[in-house]
């Protein structure tokens, strides 16, 4: 027991990852949709700096808890560069000190990119850090919500940081939040990231801000939030571009997740796993929470300095948190044709009701269903390719042949004929649109 927390056998702990927040919620930007900035209120009068003894204890226990030959440290915020380079030099020293012979230690570092310069990039390159840089598209889309403390756009500052990263050949990916503004311009976003930035690895994260209101519309979302249907169309439009020309050269996280599911494997991303609880968050003072999206008092597992991290991760409280993702699904989800890949999505977004009136439906359900059903044929084809030891990129010539066949099929279809896609709708109300 740790302060009344029931634990299981620490030797049987499943693999887990912890998002470290050494500066807490402190950030040099004031992005309008950031859900984490308000977490500063949890720690009044705090210095918001992870002390050396907390860092060292975490590094040792986290490495000890890893059964495999590789361990990944995930740095987030707030903005982690505000800790300064020397802090991360110390972290690397601790990692070297406590890692086992033959163990590979890697660091994933999420940043807004504003403070990146020669010194940072030299450090990142020499220590093989993988950067995640936040960029929401070209300037008019990025600056819609990603602003500094004075309310000014940050696009130019981020682009300067990306230029440093590319010149030093630091490995990086782009994290793009999808909101009410850029969701209307999917190809503009994708082609900017692909062609202008030259990004090879891209993540799309939907912005969903639940409003605290009462009454029948208690699940309302902010004006900044992406509409569910728009999110589905955003993903599907980009997917159609990607599957026709970029498979094997551009890697989009949700497309990789989908292909894993279609191939009979686990999705590999907590949002789409059947259960969760393996991706936790640790604040600057050692407080460990069930999830980065549940940094709230009810989901505080305990403090690292009061016990062992494995005991906290293995607690019955955390296991129940993870199982609830599966066990609380409404019947509507249990019967859904895309449950195998969606699994109800992230619990933080399950605040609307099903058509039958049951609670617990994900706000993004309509978008997920639109996207996952829309990619079914080509995903089936790629899964078959992989099963037969062929590269997924072989889907691209197949797509081109399918397009030519489709053009031939619809060229003789009148607007009032039934659509050749088999929907049962008239062509003018279906694929002609």
Predicted regions mapped to residue ranges:
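Canonical Radical SAM [4Fe-4S] cluster-binding loop centered on the CxxxCxxC motif
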Residues: 13-53, 431-433
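Flexible mid-to-C-terminal extensions adjoining Fe-S/redox cofactors in radical SAM and related proteins
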Residues: 295-415, 432-433
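Short cysteine clusters
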Residues: 27, 31-34, 270, 276, ...
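Radical SAM enzyme [4Fe-4S]-AdoMet core and its adjacent flexible, acidic
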Residues: 145-156, 163, 167-271, 275, ...
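Short Cys/His-rich zinc-binding micro-motifs
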Residues: 24, 409-425
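Radical SAM/AdoMet-radical enzyme domain recognition
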Residues: 59-74, 83-209, 430
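N-terminal [4Fe-4S]-dependent radical SAM core
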Residues: 1-20, 397-410
């Amino acid at each position: 027991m740790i302060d009344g927390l029931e634990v299981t056998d620490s030797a049987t702990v499943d693999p887990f990852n912890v998002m470290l927040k050494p500066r807490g919620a402190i950030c040099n930007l004031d992005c309008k949709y950031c859900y984490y900035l308000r977490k500063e209120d949890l720690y009044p009068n705090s210095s918001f700096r992870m002390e050396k003894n907390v860092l060292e204890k975490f590094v040792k226990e986290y490495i000890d808890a890893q059964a495999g030959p590789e361990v990944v440290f995930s740095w987030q915020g707030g903005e982690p560069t505000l800790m300064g380079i020397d802090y991360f030099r110390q972290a690397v020293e601790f990692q070297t000190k406590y890692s086992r012979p033959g163990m590979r230690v890697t660091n994933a570092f999420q940043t807004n990119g504003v403070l990146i310069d020669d010194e940072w990039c030299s450090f990142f390159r020499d220590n093989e850090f993988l950067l995640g840089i936040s960029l929401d598209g070209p300037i008019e889309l990025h600056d819609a919500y990603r602003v500094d403390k004075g309310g000014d756009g940050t696009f130019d500052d981020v682009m300067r940081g990306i230029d440093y990263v590319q010149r030093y050949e630091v490995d990086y990916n782009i994290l793009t939040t999808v909101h009410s503004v850029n969701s209307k311009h999917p190809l503009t976003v994708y082609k900017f990231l692909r062609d202008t930035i030259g990004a090879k690895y891209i993540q799309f994260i939907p912005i969903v801000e639940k409003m605290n209101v009462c009454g029948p519309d208690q699940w309302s979302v902010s004006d900044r939030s992406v509409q569910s249907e728009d999110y589905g169309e955003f993903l599907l439009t980009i997917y159609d571009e990607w599957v026709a020309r970029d498979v094997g050269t551009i890697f989009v996280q949700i497309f990789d997740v989908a292909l894993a599911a279609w191939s009979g494997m686990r999705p590999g991303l907590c949002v789409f796993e059947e259960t969760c609880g393996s991706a936790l968050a640790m604040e600057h003072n050692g407080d460990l929470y069930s999830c980065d999206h549940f940094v709230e008092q009810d989901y505080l597992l305990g403090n690292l300095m009061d016990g062992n991290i494995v005991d906290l991760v293995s607690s019955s409280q955390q296991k129940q948190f993870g199982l609830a993702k599966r066990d609380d699904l409404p019947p509507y989800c249990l019967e859904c044709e895309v449950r195998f890949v969606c699994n109800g999505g992230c619990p933080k977004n399950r605040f609307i009701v099903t058509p039958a009136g049951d609670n617990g439906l994900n706000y993004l359900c309509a978008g997920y269903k639109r996207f996952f059903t829309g990619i079914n044929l080509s995903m089936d084809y790629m899964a078959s390719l992989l099963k037969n030891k062929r590269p997924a990129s072989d889907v691209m010539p197949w797509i081109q042949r399918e397009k030519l066949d489709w053009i031939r099929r619809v060229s003789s279809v009148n607007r009032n004929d039934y659509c050749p896609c088999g929907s049962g709708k008239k062509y003018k109300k279906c694929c002609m649109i």
